[in-house]
Amino acid sequence: MEYFKNVPQIKYEGPKSNNPYAFKFYNPDEIIDGKPLKEHLRFSVAYWHTFTANGTDPFGAPTMQRPWDHFTDPMDIAKARVEAAFELFEKLDVPFFCFHDRDIAPEGETLRETNKNLDTIVAMIKDYLKTSKTKVLWGTANLFSNPRFVHGAATSCNADVFAYAAAQVKKALEITKELGGQNYVFWGGREGYETLLNTDMELELDNLARFLHMAVEYAQEIGFEGQFLIEPKPKEPTKHQYDFDAASVHAFLKKYDLDKYFKLNIEANHATLAGHDFQHELRYARINNILGSIDANMGDMLLGWDTDQYPTDIRMTTLAMYEVIKMGGFNKGGLNFDAKVRRASFEPEDLFLGHIAGMDAFAKGFKVAYKLVKDGVFDRFIEERYKSYREGIGAEIVSGKANFKTLEEYALNNPKIENKSGKQELLESILNQYLFSE
């Protein structure tokens, strides 16, 4: 069955094209710095937003019109979604997809029944993977939707829930390995608290670390060689989540001796909710060698929740890809579109239009960022700005030779301090030149 009959194969037609079903800036085979653009960007489709989201919000009923809606049996719906997914993957020519365990198969009455459902759908996906160019970027477990996780999963006050969550992640790791997933993600949507009045924060954090160590041990036991990733988010659905931002997660990993096993999956809209620029989170992760992958989306700056919009801001995508290029590119990670069409964009074709918009925006952003890095635009200015640390007293500070006594002596004998302008306006103007030069 063809699910998207009105959508042709999406091809690159260039920036002058008026075809809505064509890429304007993303030419997957364009060679930049010795490899195709598709290998630089490593695009991925998010199974949950694309195939399971129905448009429900706190104020209204589902709006999405999907070709598989006529099925009533949950397993029939799951099978139809797999068929539709690989049709979309093929028409977009996207190299990867990501999934939660509960995205691909429905939950049963018992854990055994749920695992049986998963096995059925995983076998179906494996058959498609044999002939598809699309592979699995990462898998994960949904430890937040079911009411059993009302108090958390690994941080639940109920040990029975901790055990169930462990069993669920065990299975999710197995199927991610079985499907050839290159990464495995942990996102703690319920790992946090609503009030400290009823919370043993120390025990919860210790238990979260115990849980993650168990995951590492089991992954090693089954031979899963994918990269473990943690996705920071400060709030929503929980008031205060323990994986607040990149720095919070980094401190947690360091404290519990997990930093050698984990990197971060940074999401743009989560950075917004934490009060950071997307680039800030990427920069922090990059300079600490923990940037693993990216959830590509954007938020609405006027709203205080996770809107998960398709990323269309070229300035944002440029600065994001600047950090990726400075890192040396992705290893096992990629750009996963953790984005959903708006509730009023309910037609099946909108799924393609959203991905095309995001893929074009990141392709354009990559090309601009590559020029910025190659031309050393910001590097030269930053090098000049901090040159005082390459000579004299600055060099002594950096080398560790200076101390408070020697610095006091220097300050007493150097009463005149001369600062120079930070030239922010100039640099922003130069960035605009690069953004709009083509």
UniProtKB/Swiss-Prot annotation:
The record ties this protein, via InterPro entries, to: Xyl_isomerase-like_sf, Xyl_isomerase-like_TIM-brl, Xylose_isom_bac, Xylose_isomerase
This protein's cofactor list reads: Mg(2+)
Q: Which SUPFAM superfamilies match?
A: Xylose isomerase-like
Residue numbers binding Mg(2+) 2 = E267, H270, D306, D308
The subcellular location is: Cytoplasm
Record's GO cellular component, any one? cytoplasm
Gene Ontology molecular function: magnesium ion binding; xylose isomerase activity
- Record-level GO BP terms: D-xylose metabolic process
List UniProt keywords, sorted A-Z.
Carbohydrate metabolism, Cytoplasm, Isomerase, Magnesium, Metal-binding, Xylose metabolism
**Known EC number:** 5.3.1.5
Q: Where's the active site on this chain?
A: H100, D103
Q: Which HAMAP family match?
A: Xylose_isom_A
Subunit comment: Homotetramer.
Name used for this protein in its record: Xylose isomerase
Query: What is the originating organism of this protein?
Result: Thermoanaerobacter sp. (strain X514)
